[in-house]
């Protein structure tokens, strides 16, 4: 899990979702997991 100021999709499987006002990137590749904060 990476915490970043700006999150973006890294590959085609990445999805940006909003969970309890926190933006997240979920992906099949665990390395691509991100959270904005």
Curated annotation (Swiss-Prot):
Keywords for this protein: Ribonucleoprotein, Ribosomal protein
The keyword Lipid biosynthesis appears for this protein: no
GO CC terms: cytoplasm; ribonucleoprotein complex; ribosome
Protein's GO biological process: translation
UniProt GO MF annotations: structural constituent of ribosome
Coiled-coil regions listed in the entry: none
Keyword Ligase: no
InterPro entries reported in the protein's UniProt record: Ribosomal_bL36, Ribosomal_bL36_sp
Record-stated family: Belongs to the bacterial ribosomal protein bL36 family.
Protein name: Large ribosomal subunit protein bL36
């Amino acid at each position: 899990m990476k915490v970043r100021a700006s999150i973006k999709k890294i590959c085609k499987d990445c999805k940006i979702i909003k969970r309890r006002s926190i933006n997240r990137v979920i992906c099949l590749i665990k390395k691509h997991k991100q959270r904005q904060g």
